[in-house]
Every structure is written in C-alpha cells, then in structure tokens.
Amino acid sequence: MNPAVDNEFQQWLSQINQVCGNFTGRLLTERYTGVLDTHFAKGLKLSTVTTSGVNLSRTWQEVKGSDDAWFYTVFQLSGQAIMEQDERQVQIGAGDITLLDASRPCSLYWQESSKQISLLLPRTLLEQYFPHQKPICAERLDADLPMVQLSHRLLQESMNNPALSETESEAALQAMVCLLRPVLHQRESVQPRRERQFQKVVTLIDDNIREEILRPEWIAGETGMSVRSLYRMFADKGLVVAQYIRNRRLDFCADAIRHAADDEKLAGIGFHWGFSDQSHFSTVFKQRFGMTPGEYRRKFR
C-alpha cells in the first residue's frame, strides 16, 4: 500500500469518526477517493460522503465507544453502495434510501465512485412516531417510489435553506419520518393472532397511561396472559414493558409541553401523566429528549 494513500485515508477516516461516530476502515483498492462535507442546521445533522474503494465497519467495540442515539438515514445521490446490518445486505443506487441503526454493528462498501448523504435521525423521534414498531434496517427504498422522491426533495430544500429555525428543522425531521414510514415498519414474522394481542396490549396502555395501576402484572391480568408471556411479547420487538410505559408517558408529556400555555407549571404536566416526583420527571425527560422539560419548552417558544 502506498504510504501517501494510506496516510490520506487515515486522515479521512479520522474525519468520519469525529462527525459520524466510530468506524474502522480499510481500503479495497489503491484507487481511493474520500471527501466529507458536513452540514449542521439547527436540528439537522448530516454529512455528504463522496468516496470509492473503501469499506467502513462498526463492530460492537465501535458501537460501545460512540453515541448510538441515532439512525443513519442514507440518501444515495450517485453511484452505488452496499450496506450490511443484522445479517442483511442491500445494494443501493442513485435515488435510493436505506436506514442503518447506530446502536448495532454494520458495514458499508463503496467499490466504485459513490456520493451519498447521511442524515442523523434521532432514535427518540422514531420511537415517538412509531412506538409499536421496530425499524428494519439495510432495506432498500426504491428511487421510483413517490415518497422516496419527496424525501430527497425535502432533504435538498432543507439543506439549501440555512435560515431554518430550530422548530422548522424539527418539523422537517418529523416530515421525513412520516415520508419514510414504510422502511420503519418491522416485517412481522409472528402469527396474526399474536400481533392482534400485542396491539390490544399497547392500546390498553395508552388508554390507561395516567393510571398508577398501570404495571406489568395488571396489564397481563387485563389481557389474559401471564406476566412472563407479556415480557416475551415485548422482548420479541426489542422492547421492555416498564420502559415502554415510561417512554409513552414522556411522549405525552412532551406533546403537552409543546402545546401548553406559558404559565402552565411543568411539574403539573409531569404529574398529570404519572410522574409524581418532579426531580425524577426532569431526569428521565432529559434522558429521553436530551434536555430538561424547561429547555424543551423554550425550544418550542
């Protein structure tokens, strides 16, 4: 390997790690190219990667050493790329989109010249809009699909408008999630009866979200199953019952805060949705949304 080429590659890899999270990398050929352009506009965090002859990977070691609170939403602009995750492999071409989970290992291959945009989509945003589903990754959304074309246009318009406010950037991300909904659906392998049972459970949770009695034992009794079966049902979807309930309460709190009057007490909102301890409410809210309830309110004012 030409030392000059290897040195240039290591510098580019260092840039990738600073902006996109930890990756290991190797050259597939000495005919390597690598350019990274970043774009941060309020809530939008994205990178344009132009490269060829490169393989980047995230093993469990890299995952543990970096922020995993994101999904990489990959918009292919030109050329081709191969993405691997969860024992799936997909080849994407110009105009296609795919999704990769930053919390799990993945591998990316660019044999020939390729240009793509990677948009960091917050995990909490996906969970807010799709609380009952586990996103499927390394799945190609074809460029011919109207919603894919709309997503590309929305991304380009957002990038070309540096004056977007925090609220407008947040709205753009929310619109992106809605447009990409098909790729965020987990293709279920379970029997229809089991899926209907799961939907019954999550509906029961939402209908009783403010009640103190809302615990796994009560839910199991109301839906005619054992607590163990309830836990297993949620685990099959990558969920934990108690955490799911807490996150749903926090999602309702966040929505209430966005629409609350300026003089409405934040502690009162938390209490209304089942958080009797103000300090605990502030702590878990920040864990989920990256800011305190007060900071969250100011963000939407």
Curated annotation (Swiss-Prot):
Keywords for the protein's UniProt record, in alphabetical order: Activator, DNA-binding, Transcription, Transcription regulation
Location of the DNA-binding region in this protein: 217-238, 266-289
Pfam families: AraC_binding_2 (PF14525), HTH_18 (PF12833)
GO MF term list: cis-regulatory region sequence-specific DNA binding; DNA-binding transcription factor activity
Record flagged with keyword Transmembrane helix: no
Role this protein plays: Positive regulator of tynA/maoA and feaB/padA, the genes for 2-phenylethylamine catabolism.
Protein name in UniProt: Transcriptional activator FeaR
Organism name: Escherichia coli (strain K12)
